[in-house]
Amino acid sequence: MKIVVIGGTGLIGSKVVAKLGEFGHEAVAASPKTGVNTITGEGLAEAFAGASVVIDVSNAPSWEDTAVMEFFQTSTRNQLAAEAAAGVGHHVALSIVGTERLPENGYFRAKLAQEKLIEGSSIPFSIVHATQFFEFVPAIADSTAAADGGTVRMPPALFQPIAGDDVAQAVVRASVESPLNGRVEVAGPERLSMDEFFRNALSALGDPREVVTDPHTRYYGSELDEQSLVPVGEAVLAEIKYADWLGRTTAGK
């Protein structure tokens, strides 16, 4: 089965392409690097010809509110139009747990707008909602670090991050099964408060910064409540724990 992966050269996309190949599918990595541009439409018709499934794991180059909204809306509209023309039977998109819970967050708003376009199209679809990735833990810590570099501030909101490999596996699973015409939520196996998680994580990383609990610390511009970033209903729990993932990642360097 031919499956096109939009964003197929990125962190999650490259893993998705590799896993699809392992299962014997014809996986096409589509990105500007390979001549496919979902904003201009360049290369979409050629990439989608003969495809059964299109997976979108692409990300916006800018997270500025207007830019990120324009990216996801334009990219998604162009993909859906090209899929309809090519007879693609299943659109799979990776999104975020909690898109509907942080309306003041420009990135989350843009992802929710993307989902609404997919839901309103004629293409059968599956949306995979994932929690935050282990791979981004250092960047999240840096985003709330004090100017003096000695502390990191974190709210006590619940946090249930997941390994990129497990996200890719969930996306692949959705792509080879029948369209959900709905969404599935995936999360890591461990749920902790953010402050507790980051104390453990920074210690494991050998990062000496102190983690200070602050309920008003903003997560990329948004103040969180307890359940902003975690599944509140049924979810598929991944297997890889952060400590195990970090050990493998460190050993692989």
Predicted regions and their residues:
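N-terminal Rossmann NAD(P)H-binding glycine-rich loop of SDR-like oxidoreductase domains
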Residues: M1-F23
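Non-catalytic, hydrophobic alpha-helical segments
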Residues: I12, V54, V167-V171, V186, ...
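NAD(P)H-binding glycine-rich loop region in Rossmannoid oxidoreductase-like domains
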Residues: E22-A86, V97-G106
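Conserved beta-loop-beta element that borders a ligand/cofactor-binding pocket
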Residues: G87-H90, S95, A113-F136
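A conserved pocket-lining segment of Rossmann-fold NAD(P)-dependent short-chain dehydrogenase/reductase
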Residues: F125-I127, A139-I162, D166
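Glycine/proline-rich active-site loop of Rossmann-fold NAD(P)-dependent oxidoreductases
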Residues: E135-D142, A146-D148, A174-V184, D207-R209
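Glycine-rich Rossmann NAD(P)(H)-binding loop
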Residues: R153-L158, V184-R191, L205
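Mobile cap/lid helix-loop segments that border enzyme active or cofactor-binding sites
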Residues: R191, F198-K253
